[in-house]
């Protein structure tokens, strides 16, 4: 992520700050999704990821479009995972967010290496959906691997609800990715601009 422009650095710092502070801020004011779902009587393991997965996908795809750097996914994903491990040390399943960010970073590299994909809002939106879906899937995988027996029993006992949360995360991430593409069009890096625009053809 070297040789970034000043405005790219500012964007990166701002989104990194949001990624690492949003959970503790929401926790401090009583609006953490897990608490909200619990108060509404609809709590379910992993359900908050249908909020955080698409939200992070939206932010990271916008930053990806702004900087043209695939590393924004694993770098900010790592920082977010570290932040969550300090705020919620008992919830080791948050390590799944790191795995999702690494895989999404690899997908972002593939997008950059294929000009047709990089210039397609559809592929960029699907990248956001992929990250949001992976965010939820990896959370569930890490919960099954490291979580409590009670959590595992609830998740495996309600497969349709679990799948619904995963699919919902993917769909919301895709929609927010499309919105991010529209919002970032005036600011996007040249690699994402159609050839006719970039070369004045």
Regions found by a protein language model. Name each.
Residues 28-32, 37-45, 119-201:
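Membrane-embedded alpha-helical hairpins and interfacial helices in multi-pass inner-membrane proteins
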Residues 62-75, 114-121:
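Membrane-helix interface "capping/anchor" motifs
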Residues 2-71, 105-113, 181, 185:
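Hydrophobic transmembrane alpha-helices
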Residues 27-32, 36, 79-110:
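Interfacial aromatic-anchored transmembrane helix boundaries in multi-pass membrane proteins
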Residues 16-25, 77-89, 129-140:
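Aromatic-anchored segments of alpha-helical transmembrane domains
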Residues 9-14, 54, 70-78, 95, ...:
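Hydrophobic alpha-helical transmembrane segments
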Residues 15-23, 106, 173-181:
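Hydrophobic core segments of alpha-helical transmembrane domains in multi-pass membrane transport
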